[in-house]
């Protein structure tokens, strides 16, 4: 994805307030061998971009007005506590030859055809919806697919069951980390609670 940016010459709290009143968002680009770069963004453009999952989990192209394009990764977003307003954005430069660590969303497929749902009427509980991975920029997936097609009622899928794309590893490997569980409605515990006291 691509977004537009302009160099920000004036800094400080009051300058940032003026920018926001003018429909702009202060931001910074850091990392790599170059000095940090203070930029400003169009609020509406960045607001709508942030609503797309792809903007959070892919290498972005920053088109700097009057300068060269740069490859960056979204690192953090500061939102207004109660308004739909972006206050500040942090980006990190991307080096094609240097591994990066970032979070990638999980996409769950085939839940409706799994034995857990079809045969047991289970409720699928998504315990984890994103994972942190390590890879070179060119190997960064926009998402990682988790196939629930063989999930049984009362069963679960762990981190070790996830098939990662080539060149991608978990930043914090934990084979027993539960990703998804299939919770069967009712069950012995509920039956015991509903039974009248002797």
Curated annotation (Swiss-Prot):
- Can you quote a single GO CC term? cytosolic large ribosomal subunit
Q: Spell out the molecular function terms from Gene Ontology.
A: 5S rRNA binding; structural constituent of ribosome
Matching Pfam families, A to Z?
Ribosomal_L25p, Ribosomal_TL5_C
User: One biological process GO term for this chain?
Assistant: translation
**Record bears the keyword Ribonucleoprotein:** yes
Q: What keywords appear on the UniProt entry?
A: Ribonucleoprotein, Ribosomal protein, RNA-binding, rRNA-binding
Supply the SUPFAM superfamilies for this chain: Ribosomal protein L25-like
UniProt-listed InterPro entries: Rbsml_bL25/Gln-tRNA_synth_N, Ribosomal_bL25/Gln-tRNA_synth, Ribosomal_bL25_b-dom, Ribosomal_bL25_C, Ribosomal_bL25_long, Ribosomal_bL25_short, Ribosomal_L25_dom, Ribosomal_uL5_bac-type
Q: CDD domains from the entry?
A: Ribosomal_L25_TL5_CTC
What does the sequence similarity comment in the record state about its family? Belongs to the bacterial ribosomal protein bL25 family. CTC subfamily.
This molecule's function is given as: This is one of the proteins that binds to the 5S RNA in the ribosome where it forms part of the central protuberance.
| Family matches, as NCBIfam families | bL25_bact_ctc (TIGR00731), PRK05618.1-2 (NF004128), PRK05618.1-5 (NF004130), PRK05943.1 (NF004612)
Kindly give the PANTHER family that the UniProt entry links to this protein: RIBOSOMAL PROTEIN L25/GLN-TRNA SYNTHETASE, ANTI-CODON-BINDING DOMAIN-CONTAINING PROTEIN (PTHR33284), RIBOSOMAL PROTEIN L25_GLN-TRNA SYNTHETASE, ANTI-CODON-BINDING DOMAIN-CONTAINING PROTEIN (PTHR33284:SF1)
Q: Subunit composition? A: Part of the 50S ribosomal subunit; part of the 5S rRNA/L5/L18/L25 subcomplex. Contacts the 5S rRNA. Binds to the 5S rRNA independently of L5 and L18.
Annotated protein name in UniProt:
Large ribosomal subunit protein bL25
Chain's gene name = rplY
